[in-house]
């Protein structure tokens, strides 16, 4: 499994910073601590990334949980609401250690992926390396 960084985030801020940096290095506009409007107020998201291809904008939201325990289903339920009400296309809940079985079930058949930080890096590795090659050629 190829890693983009060998850094292991010790604090939640570091996890958010690393996730933002990876998405940015993949060619996306990525920002931390973004407030998004909802039909009934607003919500703060850990990381928001947007990628435009052929004038179509894809929105990705990441919820970063640097907890020492597995993430429970209630976190997934709350994140599903955020995903639905913001119109995001893809969501990631990124965990330090993993997820409770109820969380995995709650994410099934949704546009949310439950991943560890290492799995997140693996998902974006090819895009990251291809973008670095593209940038080096220009």
Regions found by a protein language model. Give the residues of each.
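Mixed-charge (Asp/Glu-Lys/Arg
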Residues: 1-138
């Amino acid at each position: 499994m190829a890693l983009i960084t060998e850094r292991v985030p010790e604090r939640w801020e570091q996890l958010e910073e690393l996730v933002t940096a990876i998405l940015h290095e993949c060619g996306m506009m990525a920002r931390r601590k973004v407030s998004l409007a909802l039909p009934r107020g607003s919500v703060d998201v850990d990381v928001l990334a947007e990628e435009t291809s052929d004038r179509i904008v894809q929105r990705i939201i990441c919820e970063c949980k640097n907890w020492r325990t597995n993430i429970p289903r209630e976190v997934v339920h709350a994140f599903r609401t955020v995903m639905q009400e913001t119109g995001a296309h893809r969501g990631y809940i990124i965990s330090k250690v993993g997820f409770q079985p109820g969380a995995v079930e709650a994410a099934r058949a949704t546009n949310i992926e439950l991943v560890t930080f290492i799995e997140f890096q693996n998902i974006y590795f090819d895009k990251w390396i291809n973008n670095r090659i593209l940038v080096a050629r220009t």
